[in-house]
Amino acid sequence: MLEKYGRVYAAVDLSAVVENMERMKEALSPQTKMIGVIKADGYGHGAVPVGRELEKLPYVSGYATATAEEALILRRAGLKKPVLILGYTFPVSYTHLTLPTIL
């Protein structure tokens, strides 16, 4: 018989996220703009905490999400940089996307 176990827990070191972005920036030309892809709840690590760290980085010019709902979560959390929605946006979401800088 299988034993019951709890859900998997993953702790994200936000300083490691920033370090990864720093390393990528070092490999690019100075005029290259970067965008933080924060979809699927930051790939399961929490879109808002990851986004808040990326918000502090001047070379990150915005974010990308998979859905309109994810974009709205970032905006409602107070993130100010532009958000690009990568996936299909259903017409029902159009009225919610009149917030500035959601593309």
Q: Where in the sequence are the language-model features?
A:
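Hydrophobic faces of well-ordered beta-strands that scaffold small-molecule active sites
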Residues: 34-38, 63-65, 83-85
